[in-house]
Amino acid sequence: MKIITFFGSTLGIILVCLLCLINDWKIGFMMSIHVAIVAIINQIMKILIARPRPDVLPLVIERGFSFPSAHAMVSFILYGMIAYFFWNKKKIISLLLFFVILLIGVSRIYLGVHYTSDVIGGYLFSFAYLNTVFIFMKNHKWLSYT
């Protein structure tokens, strides 16, 4: 589970963003900006909500507040955007990425650093955020990166 959770960690997300930038700088830059925006929003939400982490012996040490899960929010944004861009070309990659998003959330619960509601809350916020971005992109074709 620690390997799975790595793909939602700061370092894991940065590495994937760098790979996206190398592959296509426009799309990679756009995804990196949205990842950064959501990461900042996540930290603001954590401070405002100030929910303590679960009172269990965690398998990894995490600092700070629990809600919403940053791993869930940011991985949903990044891997969700990549899945969106692959959807018309290679649906299997998109489906695998959604499975990775799900596994990252499950890993955070399994490792004892989040409640289920922390992960679901992160997913719901990111789902709403991505839908807003994609609707905006479709309504403003000049912003389309596909």
PLM feature spans:
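Hydrophobic alpha-helical bundle signature of multipass membrane enzymes
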Residues: M1-E62, V74, G80-F99
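Membrane-embedded catalytic cores of phosphoryl/pyrophosphoryl-handling enzymes
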Residues: C17, P58-T146
